[in-house]
């Protein structure tokens, strides 16, 4: 795989973007999925620009983490969010898939915290935004290895509800993929990605996913 400088220069026609809060494991997931050598920051929010990896006409994009960024002022955080939205709007036609990566154990509490302030959590806002601009979106519910097996189903139900999806979560297996990137357990996500590629008649990309 080659790191892409700009999609325009590379003749890209098919893009998959990965979005999520800082430190939810996006870069680790990309490495596990594609073997991509994407820089992984030790502190939340180290990545401030999109990181691209290209193979054939497929572009894989790791968008900057939104939300808390260590050592980054609030104003700059807003700029990163605005640039992310602008990037998605500008390239919506070629962005065929969006993967929203979340920290599963923390997600319900994060959403509830923002709800208590009468504010829309940025994760939920991003999920809704991607779908509004017509981008098929998958939820990569990461860090499930930190969840007790007995609480697995109830947590995924809570995640679905907070995303505006009625429980039980099993009704949304075509959208929600429980994974653990660090443990290499990403089978559910790979399955959903391949399902989407097949629907788009891009089985030729299976060898990269």
Swiss-Prot record:
CDD domains assigned: YihA_EngB
PROSITE patterns assigned: G_ENGB
Biological processes annotated in GO: cell division
Coiled coil: none
Residues bound to Mg(2+): 27, 47
InterPro entries the UniProt entry points to: G_ENGB_dom (IPR030393), GTP-bd (IPR006073), GTP-bd_ribosome_bio_YsxC (IPR019987), P-loop_NTPase (IPR027417)
One Pfam short name: MMR_HSR1
Gene Ontology MF terms in the entry: GTP binding; metal ion binding
EngB-type G domain ranges (all copies): 12-203
Alphabetized UniProt keyword annotations: Cell cycle, Cell division, GTP-binding, Magnesium, Metal-binding, Nucleotide-binding, Septation
Keyword Magnesium assigned: yes
Cofactor requirements of the protein: Mg(2+)
HAMAP family assigned to the protein according to its UniProt record, in alphabetical order: GTPase_EngB
Function in brief: Necessary for normal cell division and for the maintenance of normal septation.
Family label: Belongs to the TRAFAC class TrmE-Era-EngA-EngB-Septin-like GTPase superfamily. EngB GTPase family.
Protein name as it appears in the record: Probable GTP-binding protein EngB
């Amino acid at each position: 795989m080659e790191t892409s400088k700009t999609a325009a220069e590379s003749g890209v026609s098919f893009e998959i973007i990965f979005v999520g809060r800082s430190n939810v494991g996006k870069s680790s997931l990309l490495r596990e999925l594609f073997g991509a050598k994407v820089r992984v920051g030790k502190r939340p929010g180290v990545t401030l620009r999109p990181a691209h990896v290209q193979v054939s006409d497929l572009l894989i994009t790791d968008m900057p983490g939104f939300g808390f960024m260590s050592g980054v002022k609030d104003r700059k955080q807003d700029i990163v969010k605005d640039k992310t939205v602008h990037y998605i709007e500008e390239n919506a036609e070629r962005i065929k898939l969006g993967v929203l990566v979340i920290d599963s154990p923390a997600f319900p509490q994060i959403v509830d915290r923002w709800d208590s302030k009468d504010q829309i959590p940025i994760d939920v806002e991003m999920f809704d935004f991607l779908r509004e601009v017509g981008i098929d979106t998958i939820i990569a519910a990461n860090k499930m290895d930190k969840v007790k097996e007995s609480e697995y189903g109830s947590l995924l139900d809570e995640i679905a509800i907070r995303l505006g999806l009625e429980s039980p979560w099993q009704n949304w297996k075509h959208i929600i993929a429980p994974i653990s990137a660090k443990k290499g357990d990403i089978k559910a996500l790979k399955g959903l990605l391949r399902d989407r590629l097949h629907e788009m008649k891009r089985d030729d990309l299976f060898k990269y996913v």
